[in-house]
Swiss-Prot record:
Species of the source: Gymnadenia conopsea (Fragrant orchid)
Name of this protein: Defensin-like protein
Subcellular location: Secreted
Protein family: Belongs to the DEFL family.
Disulphide bond pairs: 33-75, 42-62, 48-69, 52-71
Domain of life according to the entry: Eukaryota
Gene Ontology cellular component terms for the protein in this record: extracellular region
InterPro entries xref list: Scorpion_toxin-like, Scorpion_toxin-like_sf
SUPFAM superfamilies: Scorpion toxin-like
Record Pfam families: Gamma-thionin
Amino acid sequence: MVLNNKTALWFMTLVLLLLSSREMVPGAEARLCRVRGTRGHCFNDHGCDKVCTREGFVRGKCNGILRRCICDRQC
C-alpha cells in the first residue's frame, strides 16, 4: 500500500493533534485535608500560610468568623 503525500500529511497532522491534546489534560491532583494549625488565631492569610508551610503543611489560610488558622495537608 503506497500513501501519497496528501494522505501522509493528513495522517501526521492527526497524530500530532492527538498527541498535543493529550499533553493539555491536567493530571490528577492529590486530595487535601484541612486541619487546625497550631498557631490558633490569625489576622491574614499570608502569615497563616507561612506558619503552616513551616510546620510541613502544603498551605494555610485564615478561615471563619473567629479567624482560625487552617492548614492543608495531603491525605
